[in-house]
Each structure stands twice: as C-alpha cells, then as structure tokens.
Regions:
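Extended, histidine- and acidic-residue-enriched regions that form the cofactor-binding/catalytic faces
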Residues: 1-92, 97-233
Length: 233
C-alpha cells in the first residue's frame, strides 16, 4: 500500500536572487526524494499559501506574492485530503515548506480526521523540523544562525535551491544584509519599510550547493524514519 505524498508551499518573494516558487520547489524536491525511499506517490503541489508575515516571510508587500485567506487554505487542504481518502489512500504525508501554512494545514487534518473517523493516518512536517541539531553548526560555519523566522531567502533556502534547481538561482543579484530585528508584536496596516527593499531578512552569504546537499542528506533519513514509524512501513 503506497503512501500518498503532497506538499504545501506558496508563491512568495524570496529576495532578488531566488524565484517566487522557492518554497514549492523545495517541498517538491524533498517529496520526490522521500517518495523514492518509501515507494510513495507524489501528488501535485499546492503552490499558494497563507499570508506571509513581514518578519518571517517578507510579508505581502512585494509584487508576485500571492496570498490565500486562512479559511481558503483550510478547505483546499481539507478537500484534497478527502478526495485522497475516497480514492483509497490511508497513509498520507504532507510536506510543508511555508511556515505560516502549518496551523491551517493541521486544522484541515483535524477536520478530516473527525469526518472520516480516522480512516487515514495523516502526517505533516516542515522540512526543517526533523533537522539534526548538528546540521546548524555545519551550515552556519561562517555566519551566525538568525533563527528560522528570519532564515528567509538566506543560507538554508539558497543552498537548497542551488542544490535542487541551480538554473533558477541568480546569485549575481544577491544582496548582503544585516539580519533584521524581529519585533515582539504585529501591526496593521503594514508599512513599506517593515522589511528591507530586497525582501531578504538575513544574509545568504556562504550559501552553496554543497551545503544544500548536506541538509538533504541529513534531513531525508529523518523523514524516512517518521514515515516508517507512523505508517508501519
């Protein structure tokens, strides 16, 4: 019995050097790699996601950033899960690559679980959640780790994109920035100077395809272990 895998991401600015589809591409590639390891079936991506917060994903201030409302994302994920279960899938793994999606994805999982009386085991993970702690030291050997909220279009995402899809990276357009200071509150309306003009929240200096490979090589076995445990593979 195969595991159905699909991934939620978004179309959001990722500074000047990475494409709008960065989150979708990273989630897709992790899903494809994982599917090879567990003989899974990979569904098409959900390319639109919930609103990005200014100091974790750059916010909605940039052209090309396409946002969904929370209810829209909940019922989009809900309906896809219901269709997969109707088609006979009982083991479903959701690979998330956009932090702000998670609460709404989990809400959809909860609704589906109630409506189907637990007919399927549904697992969700952000690609960075199972990352072993020692990987941070390996990746951030020359610059400090700014925290996951500010690691937007910075070292990890840039390194993963250089590994997964170097043809989509424009490294001549990188802008070295000092890590943005996270605010302890949110405010509406948003202001143009809430985030740097480049959209980057931390430096991507010293990113490389080699570091991207290190991340994949360390995270992929952890994802496999999650699937083996939860799906009894």
């Amino acid at each position: 019995e195969k595991v159905s895998k699909y991934y939620s991401a978004c179309l959001f600015e990722h500074a000047l050097h990475l494409p709008l589809c960065t989150d979708a591409k990273i989630a897709e590639q992790f899903s494809l790699h994982l599917a090879e390891e567990i003989d899974g079936v990979v569904m098409p991506t959900i390319v639109y996601g919930y609103k990005s917060k200014p100091l974790s994903g750059g916010g909605p201030l940039f052209p090309g950033t396409i946002d969904l409302n929370g209810n829209t994302l909940i019922y989009l994920v809900h309906d896809i899960l219901m269709e997969l279960i109707r088609d006979g899938f009982t083991k479903i793994f959701i690979m998330n690559a956009h932090f702000e999606n998670e609460a709404f994805v989990v809400e959809a999982m909860d609704l589906v679980n109630r409506e189907t009386n637990g007919a399927a085991t549904i697992v969700e993970s952000n690609w960075w959640d199972p990352m072993p702690e020692d990987v941070i030291d390996l990746i951030f050997d020359k610059v400090p780790f700014p925290g996951w909220a500010l690691e937007h279009a910075a070292v990890t995402e840039t390194s993963l994109m250089l590994y997964f899809a170097p043809e989509l990276c424009k490294m001549d357009r990188t802008v070295d920035v000092v890590s943005t200071n996270a605010l302890p509150y949110f405010r509406y309306p948003l202001k143009k100077d809430d985030v740097p003009e480049s959209g980057a929240l931390a430096s991507c200096a010293y990113s490389s395809a080699e570091k991207g490979k290190v991340i994949v090589d360390k995270v992929l076995p952890e994802l496999v272990n999650i699937c083996k445990k939860e799906f009894n593979l």
